[in-house]
Regions:
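N-terminal nucleotide-binding beta1-loop-alpha1 segment
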Residues: 1-21, 382
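Short loop/turn segments at strand-loop or loop-helix junctions that form parts
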Residues: 9-17, 58-59, 126, 134-137, ...
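A short, N-terminal amphipathic alpha-helix
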Residues: 34-51
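Active-site-proximal specificity loops/subdomain of glycosyltransferases
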Residues: 54-87
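Short beta-strand-to-loop acidic/aromatic patch adjacent to the donor-nucleotide binding site
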Residues: 90-100
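Conserved donor-nucleotide/metal-binding helix-loop-beta segment in metal-dependent transferases, i.e.
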Residues: 101-128
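Short, glycine-/small-residue-rich phosphate/pyrophosphate-handling segment
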Residues: 118-122, 137-167
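Conserved alpha/beta core of the MobA/IspD/sugar-nucleotide pyrophosphorylase nucleotidyltransferase superfamily
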Residues: 155-388
């Protein structure tokens, strides 16, 4: 029997093509440096479970052009395939991982991701994919060309699993595995990661990543610390308190929050899967509120409903921009500063108002993206009980 060829992952490496527009010492620079270290670690860990790795250079579309993930990924994949085949080596299992994907995943999860059977795709999250692998059939309609054709039409990596399903591949979703959904996209996500690795039972990163998380310095000399962590933790432990959470909250995260925290929880769930439904126009009641009554009024209203607020601000950004593409939102540096309640660098008027109001609120606010309101909720709950 012929030996089964090793699977190959294409892993995004931010360091392969650094963004020249990111100034040193900025929030974005910290995020890029952290994700590069995570990509290096993930590549090494894929190798430890028997998978090959090739680096993907981040795409930088010309000004005015929208990034299309599928065309970028499949061009790189076909180039790698041509090189492998020219060397006479077989390859029938191909995968992808973002630089910050699977940062807390254990080796068993990585091994499961790297082991699709022919005609199957395995992903970390069917509805918001950050890492996946498919295995092509040696003959028939589910070959390598069919898979790449399906992925080429996919505008975002978050929709990759559903694109492969539409092409006929069976789907195996690992989203219910512990920490499968945790993905580092932002400096605030790095702060969540730093908190998570201090919790019992979580995987400890290698020395390169761990040292960075401890030594990284944000603008103003701050470390990777979540704003109001102690105050939010006190609310989570208090049966008389109420927590308000708004955004793309997965059912598993909501369930964990309900069962493992002591407080009452009020959830406003909007636009789950908006990044994988790139062609749909996002809509949000909270965004409508900011447009009709102003961002500061939204902060005031949310604060009146509970003793702490956790807000997925990207839903508001997407709805106000009429697009789930981050290139249409306020610039990355402004988004990242807002997450740390720093309104000073925020030039977008509505976001500056929202950020300043949240920072000045008597009720503690946490602002962020999808990681904050998904696996980030579990991190916050577990940390609260440990008094971290």
């Amino acid at each position: 029997m012929a030996e089964r060829p090793a699977p190959l992952f294409l892993v995004v490496d931010p360091g392969a093509s650094p963004d020249p527009n990111v100034p040193p010492g900025s929030y974005a620079a910290v995020g890029e440096a952290g994700r590069r270290r995570l990509a290096i670690e993930l590549s090494r860990r894929f190798g430890s479970v028997g998978a090959g790795v090739a680096s993907l250079h981040p795409a930088r579309p010309p000004a005015g052009e929208t990034f299309h993930w599928g065309r970028w990924f499949t061009a790189a994949a076909r180039s790698v395939l041509a090189r492998v085949r020219a060397e006479g080596r077989p390859l029938n299992a191909l995968g992808y991982a973002g630089a910050g994907a699977l940062a807390l995943a254990d080796d068993a999860l990585l091994a499961a991701l790297a082991a699709p059977i022919p005609g199957e795709a395995v992903g970390n999250n069917r509805f918001s994919t950050d890492a996946f692998m498919f295995a092509a059939e040696p003959s028939g309609p589910l070959g390598m060309d069919a898979a790449l054709a399906a992925l080429e039409s996919c505008s975002t990596d978050n929709a990759a699993m559903r694109c492969l399903e539409a092409a006929g591949f069976a789907s195996r979703d690992l989203a219910n595995a512990t920490w499968a959904r945790f993905d580092v996209d932002t400096p605030l996500d790095l702060a969540l990661l730093r908190l998570a690795i201090r919790l019992p039972g979580t995987r400890r990163p290698d020395g390169l990543v761990a040292a960075f998380l401890e030594m990284a310095s944000l603008p103003g000399g701050r470390g990777l610390e979540l704003p109001h962590l102690q105050r939010v933790g006190a609310v989570l432990r208090d049966p008389e308190a109420q927590l308000v959470v708004a955004g793309r909250i997965p059912s598993a995260a909501w369930s964990y929050l309900e069962t493992e925290s002591a407080c009452r929880v009020r959830c406003f769930i909007e636009e789950r899967g908006m990044r994988s439904a790139r062609d749909a126009v996002p809509h949000s009641l909270l965004a409508d509120w900011t447009e009709r009554l102003g961002p500061a009024d939204l902060v005031k209203e949310l604060a009146s409903l509970g003793d702490a607020v956790i807000l997925d601000s990207r839903v508001i950004m997407a709805a106000r921009a009429g697009s789930s593409d981050a290139s249409a939102w306020p610039p990355a540096e402004e988004r990242f500063a807002s997450d740390f309640l720093d309104a000073t660098p925020v030039a977008t008027a509505w976001l500056a108002e929202l950020t300043a109001a949240a920072a000045e609120s008597e009720v503690p606010f946490l602002l962020g993206g999808h990681a904050l309101v998904s696996d980030g909720l579990r991190i916050l709950v577990d940390a609260a009980w440990l008094g971290r």
